[in-house]
């Protein structure tokens, strides 16, 4: 199930810059395929969307409280540092105290990371299911004021997804992850946690490099990493599963950049 905020923003309606900036943003639309996005109210958190969707699943009989053995939450925009979002959901749904609650801080790879963690939990919970929650209120950490601009604001949107994960026979699961922590500054929210904490004065006067908790992205480095590593991952995974790329009907990539997807498609042919 996917939960979307009601408010929809059309990309063209957000282009209100001076003429030169207007031309740049229109070029971005053509190259990257920007169209529209959803944005949650300032008072709406990711747990609000998760809980709304979970209650709907329960009301529709898609799953019962007794079947839930674990809650896995993947988000970069939690309600608080503490408690965890999964604990908030457990409490709001009135689930048993022995339901396992796990929060994972992941961005683009988050759904797959959460899915694999859910598979692992199922190995130790006979007869139970896992509720996997993935989502963000990303608009709050997107900024058009970054120097250099990262373009995170045009494609940053808010949404939540809930997946019911359960065992189904003895089918094999194939997966592989590549991480490069040495490039951690290429996609980072630099301020607000304990490395660069905010003082009371900074919070009151917004004396920061940019709006508090904004994302900084080195787009070219992210692009190059994806173009280099993703084809390697695909080849490794198909070899592991002993299938060919021609056997696969659809390749689904977590990426809002049309240009990057087109270039990636050329490399994996």
Role assignments for model-derived ranges:
Residues 1-43, 146-224, 232:
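Condensing-enzyme catalytic core mediating Claisen C-C bond formation in acyl metabolism
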Residues 8-9, 82-84, 116, 141-146:
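Short acidic, glycine/serine/threonine-rich loops at helix termini
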Residues 218-222, 226-235, 241, 249-255, ...:
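Internal helical hairpin/lid segments
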Residues 74-81, 248-264:
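Glycine-rich phosphate-binding loops at beta-strand->alpha-helix junctions
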Residues 123-159:
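Flexible, glycine-rich active-site loops centered on histidine and acidic residues
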Residues 53-69, 232-249:
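Phosphate/pyrophosphate-binding loops at sites that engage ATP/ADP/AMP, CoA/4′-phosphopantetheine
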Residues 26-31, 35-47, 76-129, 135, ...:
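Conserved catalytic cysteine-centered active-site region
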């Amino acid at each position: 199930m996917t939960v979307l905020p009601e408010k929809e923003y059309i990309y063209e309606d957000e282009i209100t810059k001076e003429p030169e900036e207007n031309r740049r943003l229109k070029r971005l639309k053509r190259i990257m395929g920007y169209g529209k996005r959803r944005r949650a109210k300032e008072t709406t958190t990711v747990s609000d969307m998760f809980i709304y969707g979970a209650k709907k699943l329960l009301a529709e009989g898609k799953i019962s409280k007794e079947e839930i053995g674990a809650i896995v939450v993947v988000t970069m925009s939690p309600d608080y540092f503490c408690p965890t979002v999964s604990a908030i959901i457990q409490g709001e749904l009135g689930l048993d105290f022995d339901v396992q609650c796990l929060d994972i801080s992941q961005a683009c790879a988050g759904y797959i990371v959460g899915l694999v963690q859910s598979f692992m939990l199922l190995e130790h919970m006979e007869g139970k299911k896992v509720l996997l929650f993935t989502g963000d209120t990303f608009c709050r950490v997107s900024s058009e004021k970054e120097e250099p601009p990262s373009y995170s604001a045009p494609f940053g949107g808010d949404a939540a997804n809930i997946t019911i994960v359960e065992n189904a026979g003895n089918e094999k699961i194939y997966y592989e992850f590549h991480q490069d922590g040495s490039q951690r500054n290429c996609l980072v929210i630099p301020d607000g946690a304990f490395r660069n904490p905010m003082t009371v004065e900074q919070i009151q006067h917004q004396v920061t490099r940019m709006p508090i908790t904004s994302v900084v992205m080195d787009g070219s480095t992210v692009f190059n990493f994806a173009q280099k590593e993703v084809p390697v991952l695909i080849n490794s995974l198909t070899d592991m599963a002993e299938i060919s790329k021609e056997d696969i009907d659809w390749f689904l990539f977590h990426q809002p950049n049309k240009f990057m997807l087109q270039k990636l498609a050329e490399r994996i042919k």
